Amino acid sequence: MNEFNSVFRDEIKIHLSVREAELSHEAYRHYRRTVILFDDYLCKIQHTDKEIPESVVESWIKEVSVGISLNTSSQYIHHVRQLLLFLVNSGYKCFLPRTLITHDTYVPYLYSDEDIEKIFEVADSLVVTRAAKNKYVEKEMPLLLRLLYCCGLRVGETVSIKVGDLDFDRDLIILRVTKKYKQRLVPFGKDLAEILYRYCVGMGILNDSEAYLFPGEDTHSHISANNVGNYYRIIRKKAGIDSHCQIKNGRGACLHCFRHTFAVRSFDKNERNGIKASESVPFLSTYLGHDS
C-alpha cells in the first residue's frame, strides 16, 4: 500500500527526498509525519483538484489542532506551509497559512574557540575503523565542519553542494538546494579557498562539475545529513564536548549550533568595526537565507 495517496502524492515524494537531505533524522521523522497527516486529510475529503485553496488548509489546521498545545499546532502549520511553498514553486496554486507566533525559549549552544580547536583536531585525525559504505568520510568531515563553522551553512545545503557550484574566480559557493528554495551566493575567504581547491584535487573531482563535494558511496551521490550527524557525534565525543546542555531550554552542542556560533561571531565582528547589530540584521538574514 502506498504511503501517499492524494492527488499530490508524486510531488510529495519529491519534496520529502529533498527534506530528508536537509533535516536531521528526528526532525525529518516529525516533518514526514505532518505531511502524512495532510496527505491523509486530502484523501479523506476527496480533494482531487491540483490546487489547494484557503478553505482546505484552514479546515485541516482546525482538525489537526484539536487537543494539542499551541507549540505543536504551530509546528504542524510550519511544516505544511513548507510543503505548500514547494508546491507553489512547482507551479501549483496553493494557499500559504501564516505561522503562529509562540514564545521562543530555545537557547542555542555557542562553540568556544577551545571547542572549535578540539573539534577540528579530532576531525583531522578521524579514523573510521568499522566497515563503512562511504570511503570518503575521513577526508570529507574535516572540510564539511569547516564550511559549517566558517560560512554558517545548514547541513542539508552543505551536503548538496556540487563541484560546479564552486566559483574559485570569485571565491563563492552557489547554494541551489536551500530551505526556502531560493538560490543564494555565499563567499569564502582565501584560506578556505585554498583548502577547498586542494581537497577537490585530492578527491579527483576538480574537473567534474556534477560531482558532489561530499560524496556518499560514489561522487554522484552525496553523504546524507543523518550520516554527517552520526559521524559528528563520534567527533564531538572524542573532543570531550558534552552534548547535554545544563541550561534550561538549551539544545546542547550539535551541528546546527555551528550556524548559531557563526551568526553571533558575525554580529560581534561587525560591532567591533562600528556597525550596530540593528544595521547588520538585514544583511546577515539574507546571507543566512532567512526571510527576515
What spans do the regions from the language model cover?
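Conserved catalytic core of the tyrosine transesterase superfamily
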Residues: 1-292
